[in-house]
Amino acid sequence: MKTLTFLLSTVIELYTMVVLLRVWMQWARCDFYNPFSQFVVKATQPIVGPLRRIIPAMGPIDSASLLVAFILCVIKAIVLFMVITFQPIIWISALLILLKTIGSLIFWVLLLMAIMSWVSQGRSPVEYVLMQLADPLLRPIRNLLPSMGGIDFSPMVLVLLLYVINMGVAEVLQATGNVLLPGMGMELRMPLKPAQDGRCRAR
């Protein structure tokens, strides 16, 4: 059962990231003729396309894709907590999972951008889209940071902010997990340290 739950939650999270990429690319006004952008659009169009005819966009935000991402997080929350009936806490957990997924997506985009800057050196179409995605987030930080002799520390600052936010979200997710089913929230955290684990078993 745990293996199936892990597989389902992983597949849902990966697809949620692809949907969020679509929202992010529209917000950042990325080149949608780029091969990578076309992949994201084609992968999400079967679900997002029909909703876009009903739900209008909110300025640069693709509200239909954002709604799909939230629904996927609701499903993931139900899978993680193994709850059949809808409880109010599920919606809170889904929102927190959505925020956590957004943070993870930003982190992986920054990491891939850093790796590809060494490997492809600007020749890859994927790197071009990653730079377009990251620029709206990094530009305000660059404006605040003083000049560091040509070294860009804005990605490090953003990763640090994401880490702090992720820690806070993880704490709240643990609390909501314990409210739903005692002990379930612990699955969302890191395992106990060996010394602590040993003391627990000794008791």
Tell me the role of every PLM-derived stretch.
Residues M1-R203:
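Selective transmembrane helix interface/packing segments
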